[in-house]
Amino acid sequence: MHPPNDRPWLLAIQEIPGYNHRPLYERAGFQVAIEYSVRRALARLKTLVPQVIVADFSKRHFHDRVSNLESLLAACNRFPSARVLILHDPAHESDLAQLLARCPADATLPLPVQDTALMQMLERWARPT
């Protein structure tokens, strides 16, 4: 575990209700910031430099893009060392593939997320590089 001021930041964008991974994020060694919309997450990225970004992918119907995550993933270009994990409903796998073709992410996990898989990934990403 990192000392309190030395722990890396994890920004979680939780638009799908029904789960709380904050305790798991903290156990993996992160300071945690949670936003409930991409718009608020984009505002938060003006003052926060996260090591990990965890975002929900939910299929929304936009006329010009697959998801509002496109804006978030584009903003992540300012943080080249940040790791991006997308949590998704398996029913939207083809829509997620479209998004990832435009804006790559480091990993995806289907909902409901298996805590052990998430924890292993986060512990690996929490280690200093």
Language model feature labels by segment:
Residues L11-P17, D56-K59, L87-P90, L111:
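Structural motif
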Residues P50, P80-S81, P104:
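Proline-centered flexible-loop/turn and helix-kink motifs
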